[in-house]
């Protein structure tokens, strides 16, 4: 079935229930929904109980803004920071039922030591979550990250593979104990996801070929996905065509649960396209994963020398130019 799901934030989502119902009754339920401080569980329980649901909060019980991560990221003791952060998160999680909970959003270290810190932080988050009966959705790196930082402002150069290697212990634990990984993929200045492949779209395949060697490849959700920076500034037809192309690719990969189109709600609201998306998702058959027993299919992400494509350029590429290596 289709692997297209939705990212949902505050704003109009009229028609969501009808969409969920149509897809579920057709035997092709939405694979996944990610929400930010929106209670979607009742809709899923009523219309689409098979849908995987991920929740993230930006507030604590005192209605104070928490943001995307703790203020002591990378500087404080990672275990203590995790304990303090989870103490703020979990009371909100207890009020919002979900299958998985995301403790971080788009924390992208500028130095390799930051990934070492993140691994220790997330390992303690996993300790606390498991002791309290929660499953986590880890990391949620932004589009194009982790990336090669070959000329850092300070510290030593490192590649995306170096970054992933620092995270292997927490990802091994995640896979072993039923947690998942989140990543974001956008077209950015390439405009469409299709044009951005493999520099932005489908870059997870490179990571998963590496992580699988260490049994550190948990199930994956692309929790934000869209042409551009979300459904805005691009024609509906072009955006939908890009969604269908992206879906045709991620359906090939066994590791991918699904993607969450950005977004239902907010300034990028695609609510007017819900009927179109419902028709597409409900009518899309289920192909066998082309990756077979492997987590992902092979992908063209190597340069002429057989090295990973450097991606210092990923945020500055023009819309109609394929970057030089």
Where are these regions (language model features)?
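Aromatic-rich peripheral "rim/lid" segments of glycoside hydrolase catalytic domains that contact
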Residues: 5, 20-24, 49-54, 232-324
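Acidic (Asp/Glu)-rich catalytic clusters
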Residues: 19-27, 40-55, 89-97, 130, ...
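Aromatic- and acid-rich polysaccharide-binding/catalytic face
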Residues: 51, 55-65, 105, 140, ...
């Amino acid at each position: 079935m289709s692997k297209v799901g939705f990212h949902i934030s505050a704003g109009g989502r009229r028609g969501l229930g009808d969409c969920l119902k149509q897809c579920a009754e057709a035997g092709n339920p939405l694979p996944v929904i990610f929400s930010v401080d929106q209670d979607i569980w009742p809709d899923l329980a009523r219309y689409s109980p098979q849908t995987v649901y991920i929740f993230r909060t930006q507030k604590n019980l005192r209605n104070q803004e928490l943001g995307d991560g703790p203020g002591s990221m990378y500087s404080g003791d990672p275990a203590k920071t995790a304990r303090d952060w989870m103490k703020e998160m979990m009371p909100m999680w207890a009020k919002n039922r979900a299958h998985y909970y995301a403790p971080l959003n788009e924390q992208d270290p500028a130095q390799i030591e930051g990934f070492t810190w993140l691994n220790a932080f997330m390992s303690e988050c996993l300790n606390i979550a498991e002791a309290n009966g929660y499953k986590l959705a880890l990391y949620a790196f932004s589009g194009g990250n982790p990336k090669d930082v070959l000329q850092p402002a300070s510290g030593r150069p490192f590649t995306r593979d170096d970054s992933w290697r620092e995270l292997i212990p927490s990802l091994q634990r995640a896979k072993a104990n039923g947690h998942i990984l989140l990543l974001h993929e956008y077209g950015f200045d390439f405009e469409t996801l299709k044009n951005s492949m493999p520099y932005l779209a489908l870059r997870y395949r490179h990571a998963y070929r590496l992580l699988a060697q260490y049994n550190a490849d948990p199930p994956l959700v692309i929790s934000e996905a869209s042409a551009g920076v979300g459904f805005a500034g691009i024609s509906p037809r072009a955006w939908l065509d890009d969604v269908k192309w992206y879906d045709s690719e991620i359906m090939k990969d066994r590791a991918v649960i699904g993607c969450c189109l950005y977004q239902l709600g907010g300034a990028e609201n695609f609510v007017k396209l819900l009927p179109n998306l419902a028709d597409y998702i409900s009518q899309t058959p289920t192909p066998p994963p082309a990756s077979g027993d492997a987590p992902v299919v092979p992908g063209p992400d190597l340069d002429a020398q057989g090295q990973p494509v450097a991606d210092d350029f990923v945020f500055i590429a023009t819309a109609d130019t394929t970057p030089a290596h």
